[in-house]
């Protein structure tokens, strides 16, 4: 069992929604080139940018009540880049080699410190073993004959812990226009899990929030406003 499971705290972070409900995708587009240049200037990856946006937005939505809460960022790590990868594994397609890691982050004093904190935590995990452990552990959950997934009793409910999910999909469909990203999952009585994704096509940098159709509108507004605030911060950042 992954060690990080023992560090999770039961808490309801997301607004309650009435059932039935379904997932919709809200997308915001920005010019890619200036954002890419700004991120390189401060040596921060898009993934760290997403982590910073979501965790600061969630804390703002809760009006300071969870400022001292350590948040676990549930994200994919390419296990090919770790020291545990052999030559055969390195040749596999990406999604066959993506492990899951939970990266714990704390609130920092300002946006820049948050960006650097998230960058460093992400870098630590890329050189660690958590994603590899999860990759191996989850492979044992699949029944080879029926392909059913046997969920262990000790597996935490992702909807009811101090977990957020962000994922940068990277570069997609270069040369195409008006790209839209969509993903659906069920909303049950157990809850739901708003996801924040990013992708680019060399021209547009897109953020996509997956959320219930009847979620508190303030939640969406806070995510959007925080995205704009942090992107404007990196675009206008000047070293002291």
Regions found by a protein language model. Give the residues of each.
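Short, charge-rich, low-complexity alpha-helical interaction segments
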Residues: 1-6
């Amino acid at each position: 069992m992954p060690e990080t499971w023992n560090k999770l705290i039961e808490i309801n972070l997301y607004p309650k929604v009435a059932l039935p409900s379904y997932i919709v995708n809200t997308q915001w587009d920005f010019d890619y080139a200036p954002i890419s240049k700004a991120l390189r200037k401060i040596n921060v990856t898009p993934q760290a940018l997403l982590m910073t946006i979501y965790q600061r937005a969630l804390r703002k939505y809760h009006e300071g009540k969870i400022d001292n809460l350590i948040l676990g960022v549930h994200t994919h790590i390419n296990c090919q880049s770790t020291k545990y990868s052999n030559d055969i594994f390195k040749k596999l397609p990406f999604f066959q080699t993506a492990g899951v890691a939970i990266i714990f982050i704390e609130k920092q004093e300002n946006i820049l410190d948050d960006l650097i904190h998230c960058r460093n935590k992400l870098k630590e995990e890329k050189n660690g073993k958590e994603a590899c452990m999860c990759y191996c552990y989850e492979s044992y959950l699949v029944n080879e004959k029926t392909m059913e997934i046997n969920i262990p009793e000790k597996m935490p409910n992702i909807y009811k812990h101090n977990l957020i999910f962000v994922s940068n999909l990277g570069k997609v469909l270069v040369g195409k226009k008006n790209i839209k990203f969509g993903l659906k999952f069920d909303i049950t009585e157990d809850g739901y899990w708003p996801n924040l994704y990013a992708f680019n096509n060399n021209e547009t940098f897109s953020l996509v929030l997956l959320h219930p159709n009847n979620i508190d509108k303030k939640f969406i507004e806070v995510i959007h406003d925080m995205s704009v605030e942090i992107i404007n911060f990196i675009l206008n950042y000047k070293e002291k």
